């Protein structure tokens, strides 16, 4: 996957975290929702399109293969690890 996409959408996925830090929100903000939405904004629109295009280019298939959904879910999780790890660490530290 391309680094340019990550760098373009990284500030967009960090906006909820920046707002919490700016306004010093001490009440029970749904941090898990913010954590999931920041990962979803950054990764989901790109993951399935890129994987399907890569498979079609390399295998010369005309239609989507049966394993595309499982493969895109696996790559979605693998891409979410480096993006969501800082948010997850912040979420667990704030919870304790």
Curated annotation (Swiss-Prot):
Transmembrane segments: 73-93
GO cellular component: plasma membrane
One Pfam family matching this protein: CKI
A single GO BP: bacteriocin immunity
Subcellular location: Cell membrane
Keywords recorded for this protein, A-Z: Bacteriocin immunity, Cell membrane, Membrane, Plasmid, Transmembrane, Transmembrane helix
Role played: This protein is able to protect a cell, which harbors the plasmid ColK encoding colicin K, against colicin K.
Name of this protein: Colicin-K immunity protein
